[in-house]
Amino acid sequence: MINYSSCSYLLKLCRTLKHLHQFHAQFITSGRISNDFKQNSVFANVLFAITSISPSASASKEVVSYATSVFRFITNPSTFCFNTIIRICTLHEPSSLSSKRFFVEMRRRSVPPDFHTFPFVFKACAAKKNGDLTLVKTLHCQALRFGLLSDLFTLNTLIRVYSLIAPIDSALQLFDENPQRDVVTYNVLIDGLVKAREIVRARELFDSMPLRDLVSWNSLISGYAQMNHCREAIKLFDEMVALGLKPDNVAIVSTLSACAQSGDWQKGKAIHDYTKRKRLFIDSFLATGLVDFYAKCGFIDTAMEIFELCSDKTLFTWNAMITGLAMHGNGELTVDYFRKMVSSGIKPDGVTFISVLVGCSHSGLVDEARNLFDQMRSLYDVNREMKHYGCMADLLGRAGLIEEAAEMIEQMPKDGGNREKLLAWSGLLGGCRIHGNIEIAEKAANRVKALSPEDGGVYKVMVEMYANAERWEEVVKVREIIDRDKKVKKNVGFSKVLS
């Protein structure tokens, strides 16, 4: 039998929604608590217990629905209760309007917000697609009115939100206006600057920090690597080690990525040796980075050895290995590792299929690619994207199946990006050149010209094909077009997409 004194202890043991339902049912049927204050207290504790449920542990809508029903049992909910329900909605349904509706209700009831109120409402505004900047600015004004921006957690959250959904200068202005900062404040803004590709300003802010932590170093090293500033990433990593700091796996993987991009395999191997000397634990994240590095630098056997030693392979680890095999033209091994991945219980994603299709293309495994492409939706529940159609079109074109390749491109999603369509039609044009299919080459050339009018390489290919077929009248017509169009004439020996 549940009594008031045992409620808090029992709620701490609840880790799933089912446990909370059982507690709730026992609490109601016991009928032992008639005091409204105690009843409100129990429901407030139930509400707080819901925050410990992982968003992945239960269906998000079910969690929010249950939390809302519990909240409605509370008479005159306090600031704590409103903060808790707002937090639950933000954690489980960040893109919904629930968090904001509860905040509006809170203000309508004249319940005063505190330091815990605004951060989760800010996050809910940022989680919505494209963000709700107008509402964020309104909430910003309210936080100022209540004097809550003096709280660093609130300030740091707002800086992060501005960096996500507004021009980065908004976050910088807020940073400059508030002299009260901690290392998290700097880290949040550095991360925002990196995401905005303002790497120079990120470095300036990093250099001005009175105190740095691992996150500070990781953010900048990762930013350099992402923007292909490989030397700067490697140099910063070396500086970090020279200062006696112990880099974690995030810094190591980012630097390995920079080594792979720059082809500096010796430095990458030295970093791998460093992990061995320091006896760092090679988790799936670091193993993925090492596999990716060695595969990109041409050491596919070493990549395979590291892959096999990894005991906790994730989707990303498998993708790194499969992509590496595809890059090296090992089509049969690519398919073999794909089968092993599926057998191990890992569900493939779109990246997996792009790599497998590329591997099949390099090895001429047409039937295997067809089967995998057909199974993407039916067997693996993976949506086909523009790149998948492009890979199939390239594979079919290489194999001389020009008509089928053209049909594949025609099936590409109508709302897809022009770049992917351009690459697909250009690849088909290249296949037509190899196999001498002028009829489809003309169709492909027209599509390429429509998507990239200044690409002179198209005309060069058509002149070559017409000349090989001794269709001299068409050769003359194409040359006349080249002579008339100055832009085409300028780029006739150059193509962005044709080899």
From Swiss-Prot:
Residue numbers spanned by region Type E motif: 424-499
GO biological process: RNA modification
Keyword rRNA-binding among record annotations: no
Pfam families registered for this protein in UniProt: E_motif (PF20431), PPR (PF01535), PPR_1 (PF12854), PPR_2 (PF13041)
Gene Ontology molecular function: any one: RNA binding
Annotated keywords: Repeat
PPR repeat segments: 78-113, 114-150, 151-181, 182-212, 213-247, 248-282, 283-313, 314-348, 349-379, 385-419
Keyword Heme appears in the UniProt entry: no
PANTHER family in alphabetical order: PENTATRICOPEPTIDE REPEAT-CONTAINING PROTEIN, PENTATRICOPEPTIDE REPEAT-CONTAINING PROTEIN ELI1, CHLOROPLASTIC-LIKE ISOFORM X2
Family: Belongs to the PPR family. PCMP-E subfamily.
Name under which the protein is recorded: Pentatricopeptide repeat-containing protein At5g61800
Organism expressing this protein natively: Arabidopsis thaliana (Mouse-ear cress)
